[in-house]
Swiss-Prot record:
Its main location: secreted. This is Temporin-1Lc. Belongs to the frog skin active peptide (FSAP) family. Temporin subfamily. The modification Leucine amide is found at residue 14. Antibacterial activity against Gram-positive bacterium S.aureus. Weak activity against Gram-negative bacterium E.coli and C.albicans. It comes from the Eukaryota. One of its GO terms (biological process) is killing of cells of another organism.
Length: 14
């Protein structure tokens, strides 16, 4: 998992 994808997912959830 890339940090960028995780960041986008977190922004989406938040």
């Amino acid at each position: 998992f890339l940090p960028i994808l995780i960041n986008l997912i977190h922004k989406g959830l938040l």
